[in-house]
């Protein structure tokens, strides 16, 4: 149970960061390519066969889960599960506690992402409930318990000062997974099947050589996640730290297109990933549905960029949209303000001197962050819709 939770936890990080790791979406430029990309996927003449193959693999995994659960003592099972998540949480806590206090103003961003991740966890819960026993409800609950720390890792990995810490945390997580897999009495649920389904479809590895290949694949996935987050951070800072008024219109337009293209490429990779997980058994109707959703997100991004480039954004008097955003930030930060009262008192004099300029700067920064957060929410909706469609049998 504990190991299965750890692997599900890795799956969520993989899907989530791929979709949210980049701030904006341009599907105009890639749709000329995206449609041709879809053509590369093998056409399935009988979708029922494809979904039967997927269901069969899922049944096999869940059968292993059922058998292993029946062989374990309930108390031992709970203890092992608690120990695993305690160890993961301790790793995150050591690095993140100070940052959470210092970056209280960013908590509202984490909560928005948290709501989106809740949707993914609910989806996993629904799938498990269809085929597993009541004990499987513990899986999404445990993931939810560790969720806050996971999100803090993703957020803080955007900061250059945390690059080394992020790398260390990823190594620690890998060690935990490796230790769980090597344990004689509690091997991961369905062993390496879940990891393999995320990385490369094929037969279950039954010797050390194949196991080593899968371990290397997991490491590559984690390294790729880290690279995506770091690249996204650089791209966003390059755009948002530039004064639009001092920039030639053609240059700004090129930057806007770059934002679209970067995240657009992530979505194309996601489509390839869905194809890989199912071994090529995805009906093309799903791609059409993804494409429609991507068009909607593309329109949303265009509006957000237009709003970002609007001269009125930097005026002293914000419009209703930004007033509403400021109200939201104020509400979310109330608790953080209470925790930091002592520090605020010490800095009152300096804050008073800088109130006018700081308020305007923070407002502009929050407005930019809000556009990016909304984009991340829409992207995750695309993922959820796509995965739900993938798990819904299609009649031919």
UniProtKB/Swiss-Prot annotation:
Region feature (Disordered): 231-260, 288-378
Compositionally skewed regions (Acidic residues) per UniProt: 231-256
Any one cellular-component term (Gene Ontology): extracellular region
N-terminal signal peptide: 1-21
Keywords on record: Coiled coil, Secreted, Signal
Tissue expression profile of the protein: Component of the acid-insoluble and acid-soluble organic matrix of calcified layers of the shell (at protein level).
Subcellular location, record wording: Secreted
Keyword Flavoprotein recorded: no
Parts forming coiled coils: 53-73, 109-129, 208-242, 287-308
The protein, known as: Coiled-coil domain-containing protein 1
Taxonomic source organism: Lottia gigantea
């Amino acid at each position: 149970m504990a190991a299965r939770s750890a692997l599900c936890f890795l799956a969520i990080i993989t899907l989530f960061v791929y979709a949210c790791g980049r701030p904006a979406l341009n599907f105009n430029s890639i749709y000329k390519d995206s449609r041709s990309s879809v053509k590369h996927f093998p056409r399935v003449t009988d979708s029922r066969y494809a979904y039967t193959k997927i269901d069969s693999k899922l049944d096999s995994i869940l059968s292993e889960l059922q058998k292993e659960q029946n062989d374990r003592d309930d108390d031992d099972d709970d203890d092992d599960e608690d120990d695993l998540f305690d160890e993961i949480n301790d790793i995150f806590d050591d690095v993140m506690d100070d940052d959470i206090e210092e970056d209280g103003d960013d908590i509202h961003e984490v909560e928005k992402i948290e709501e989106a991740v809740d949707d993914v966890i609910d989806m996993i819960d629904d799938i498990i409930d269809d085929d597993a026993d009541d004990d499987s409800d513990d899986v999404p609950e445990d993931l939810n318990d560790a969720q806050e720390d996971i999100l803090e890792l993703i957020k803080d990995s955007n900061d250059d000062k945390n690059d080394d810490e992020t790398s260390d945390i990823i190594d620690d997580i890998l060690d935990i997974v490796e230790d769980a897999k090597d344990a004689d009495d509690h091997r991961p649920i369905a062993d390496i099947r879940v990891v393999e389904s995320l990385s490369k479809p094929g037969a279950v590895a039954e010797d050390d050589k194949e196991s080593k290949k899968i371990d290397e694949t997991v490491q590559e996935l984690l390294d790729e996640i880290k690279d995506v987050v770091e690249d996204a951070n650089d791209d966003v800072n390059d755009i948002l730290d530039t004064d639009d008024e001092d920039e030639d219109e053609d240059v700004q337009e090129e930057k806007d297109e770059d934002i679209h293209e970067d995240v657009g490429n992530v979505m194309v990779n996601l489509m390839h990933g869905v194809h890989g997980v199912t071994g090529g058994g995805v009906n093309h109707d799903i791609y059409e549905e993804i494409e429609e959703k991507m068009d909607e997100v593309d329109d949303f991004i265009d509006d957000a960029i237009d709003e970002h480039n609007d001269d009125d954004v930097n005026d002293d008097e914000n419009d209703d949209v930004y007033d509403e955003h400021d109200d939201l930030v104020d509400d979310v930060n109330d608790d953080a303000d209470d925790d930091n009262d002592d520090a605020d008192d010490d800095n009152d004099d300096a804050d008073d001197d800088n109130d006018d300029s700081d308020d305007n700067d923070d407002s502009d920064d929050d407005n930019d962050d809000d556009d990016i957060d909304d984009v991340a929410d829409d992207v995750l909706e695309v993922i959820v819709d796509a995965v739900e469609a993938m798990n819904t049998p299609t009649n031919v």
